[in-house]
Design a protein with these regions (language model features):
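C-terminal recognition in membrane/secretory proteostasis and scaffolding
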Residues: 1, 326, 335-447
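Short beta-strand elements that form the blades of beta-propeller/WD-repeat-like
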Residues: 6-8, 22, 29
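Metal-dependent peptidase/peptidase-like ectodomains
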Residues: 193, 203-302, 313-320
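His/Asp/Glu-rich mid-to-C-terminal helical/loop segments that flank catalytic regions of hydrolases
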Residues: 32-33, 303-349
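Second-shell loop/turn segments in exported
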Residues: 50-59, 75-91, 120-124, 164-174, ...
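N-terminal hydrophobic or amphipathic helices/low-complexity stretches enriched
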Residues: 31-93, 99-101, 106, 147
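Alpha-helical metal-binding/catalytic segments enriched in His/Glu/Asp
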Residues: 136, 152-210, 327
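A non-catalytic alpha/beta surface segment that caps or lines the substrate-entry region
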Residues: 79-139
Length: 447
């Protein structure tokens, strides 16, 4: 009746309107400009508002960094299992002592009175080497589930020294995983009582063929009794998340894994990606091969993998804090679940590690994209000064064949590379956008 006014005033009993009008509001955030009227007015934006306070992260970057910096100290000689020590160096034994001390500090129970699981392992070169896993326990409350523990694990060994005698730091691989393992175990010990036990393990000998996890699965500590492992989560290279989705390998081994990962993403905001393959060079495979549902949590490959440049300063500690929160949620889900998982191990394919291993001398130097599901192998980058770098391979190239042999997936790519030697010349067919490109590369030693 009156139209739109900013103010109206009335007098008398009738009442009678005596004043009305519209305030000028050229930049009010309440103004709406009808786009059909073609107005040229520019409204001021809303001022930035700072929150009164912010919650600190559940897992502090400084605590995670403290573990990483200790485990990457040069005196540990790259945490190699066969390094000869000088009087001033601790080697991998120093890393083991540090982890034992942390297990004791945070209140993990020592199984059978000791955190050490020590045995004699025969290496590929025939040498017999004493190795030690570090094992701690968070007891469960239900006696009926006492022999069905969840295992949370991360390997603490690395590559030792390079040919110049310089230690490989192994910050992402795998000081990052051990740091998360310790911090999450500390939180669970303080604030969570699971119905089934949770076993915390730092494995040795992963880089030499999963020696620690194979021994743990085949010969678990006797104090655990007649154990049947319920499930296993493996932390390996979780320090370079950098805003990406967390990769979870092996999710096909139990029906519940994808739903658990999805639920955790909704709860804490750390999203997961479930690649349809498993990296065969990490410790969860020892459990898969023994019928235990197991997943590998992974932040993604990078060009510092197995290089001197994999240092503590390169890690994403904010992302590492998110990984720790993810693991805590997963451990609580499994630890308070009394029903068995619906095991689907037949659906969990295993592929060989694609970026090179001690057994394969020749290397192309590509960084594969595990999230790619199409034909061939898409690469996310190349190792500097590698064969791939020399011939101009680049991000998003898709490798379709090697010497005329079709590369259907990461499995075949890995298998084909293992048939070549250093110095072999390989014709590589690429899909580069809309173009098919062929280049010829001379394979080199791993760098």
């Amino acid at each position: 009746h009156y139209g739109k006014y900013s103010y109206l005033s009335f007098v008398g009993d009738a009442p009678t309107n005596d004043v009305k009008g519209v305030w000028a509001s050229s930049d009010s955030p309440l103004v709406w400009l009808n786009p059909e009227r073609g107005s040229t007015r520019v409204l001021a934006g809303l001022p930035a508002v700072t929150a009164l306070t912010e919650l600190p992260p559940k897992y502090l970057a400084a605590n995670l960094a403290r573990h990483v910096e200790k485990l990457t100290d040069a005196g540990l000689l790259g945490r190699g299992i066969t390094q000869v020590l000088s009087p001033r160096d601790e080697g991998i034994e120093g890393a083991a002592r540090y982890i034992q001390g942390e297990f004791r500090r945070i209140g993990l129970q020592a199984i059978g009175g000791s955190y050490l699981q020590t045995w004699q392992a025969t290496l590929d070169n025939g040498k017999v080497q004493q190795l030690s896993n570090l094992v701690g326990l968070i007891p469960g409350s239900d006696p009926a589930l006492a022999n069905q523990p969840v295992v949370l694990g991360a390997h603490y060994d690395h590559l030792g020294l390079d040919e110049r005698g310089i230690p490989f730091p192994g910050a992402d691989d795998n000081a990052s995983g051990v740091a998360v393992l310790i911090e999450v175990a500390a939180k669970l010990t303080r604030a969570f009582t699971p119905v089934r036990p949770i076993v915390i393990v730092a494995f040795s000998g992963e880089e030499s063929g999963l020696l620690g996890s194979k021994h743990f699965v085949s010969s678990p500590p006797s104090a655990l009794g007649d154990v049947g492992f319920y499930a296993m989560i493996n932390l390996d290279a979780v320090g370079r998340l950098e805003g990406r989705k967390l990769q979870v390998f092996g999710s096909e081994s139990a029906y519940e894994w994808p739903f658990m990962a999805q639920g955790i993403g909704y709860t804490i905001g750390v999203e997961s990606q479930l690649p349809a393959q498993t990296i065969a060079s990490s410790d969860h495979v020892s459990f898969l091969n023994n019928g235990v549902p197991a997943i590998h949590v992974f932040s993604g490959l990078h060009t510092d993998y197995h290089r001197i440049s994999d240092s503590a300063t390169e890690l994403d500690y904010e992302g590492l804090s998110g990984v720790a929160s993810w693991l805590e949620e997963a451990a609580m889900y499994l630890g308070q679940r009394s029903e068995p998982l619906r095991v689907t191990l037949a659906n969990a394919p295993v592929v060989v590690a694609p970026l090179g291993s001690e057994e394969r001398g020749a290397s192309l130097g590509t960084v594969p994209d595990f999230a790619y599901f199409g034909a061939g192998v898409r690469i996310t980058g190349v190792i500097p000064d590698s064969a791939a770098d020399a011939v101009g391979l680049r991000q998003n190239d898709i490798i379709m064949s090697l010497n005329g042999q079709t590369v259907t997936d990461l499995q075949t790519y890995s298998n084909l590379l293992r048939t070549y030697a250093i110095g072999d010349v390989v014709a590589i067919e690429l899909n580069r956008g809309e173009e098919i490109v062929t280049v010829t590369a001379t394979l080199t030693a791993r760098r």
